[in-house]
Amino acid sequence: MPSPEMESRLKKIVAEQLGVDESKIVPEARFTEDLNADSLDLVEMIMELEEAFGVEIPDEDAEKIMTVQDALNYIEQKLQAA
């Protein structure tokens, strides 16, 4: 399970990248439908997450990250595998 620190850090990044209030960034929030991200927003957000967490997220994996929880789970899995 992702740590509260990881979740908080991810929320800050998503809020900055997508220009949304952190209160709207809940685990089940979908980036495109709920947080109004377009494809460019998603690319920039993924790049920022890669830098912040020191992980590489290949395009084919990035396409599967649809919700905040998906992002948390993916990053946690990558960090544990490192």
From Swiss-Prot:
<dbReference type="GO" id="GO:0016020">
    <property type="term" value="C:membrane"/>
</dbReference>
<keyword id="KW-0276">Fatty acid metabolism</keyword>
<keyword id="KW-0596">Phosphopantetheine</keyword>
<comment type="similarity">
    <text>Belongs to the acyl carrier protein (ACP) family.</text>
</comment>
<dbReference type="GO" id="GO:0000036">
    <property type="term" value="F:acyl carrier activity"/>
</dbReference>
<dbReference type="Pfam" id="PF00550">
    <property type="entry name" value="PP-binding"/>
</dbReference>
<comment type="pathway">
    <text>Lipid metabolism; fatty acid biosynthesis.</text>
</comment>
<dbReference type="GO" id="GO:0000035">
    <property type="term" value="F:acyl binding"/>
</dbReference>
<protein>
    <recommendedName>
        <fullName>Acyl carrier protein</fullName>
    </recommendedName>
</protein>
<keyword id="KW-0597">Phosphoprotein</keyword>
<dbReference type="InterPro" id="IPR006162">
    <property type="entry name" value="Ppantetheine_attach_site"/>
</dbReference>
<dbReference type="InterPro" id="IPR009081">
    <property type="entry name" value="PP-bd_ACP"/>
</dbReference>
<dbReference type="InterPro" id="IPR036736">
    <property type="entry name" value="ACP-like_sf"/>
</dbReference>
<feature type="domain" description="Carrier">
    <location>
        <begin position="4"/>
        <end position="79"/>
    </location>
</feature>
<feature type="modified residue" description="O-(pantetheine 4'-phosphoryl)serine">
    <location>
        <position position="39"/>
    </location>
</feature>
<keyword id="KW-0275">Fatty acid biosynthesis</keyword>
<dbReference type="GO" id="GO:0005829">
    <property type="term" value="C:cytosol"/>
</dbReference>
<dbReference type="GO" id="GO:0009245">
    <property type="term" value="P:lipid A biosynthetic process"/>
</dbReference>
<dbReference type="InterPro" id="IPR003231">
    <property type="entry name" value="ACP"/>
</dbReference>
<keyword id="KW-0963">Cytoplasm</keyword>
<comment type="function">
    <text>Carrier of the growing fatty acid chain in fatty acid biosynthesis.</text>
</comment>
<keyword id="KW-0444">Lipid biosynthesis</keyword>
<keyword id="KW-0443">Lipid metabolism</keyword>
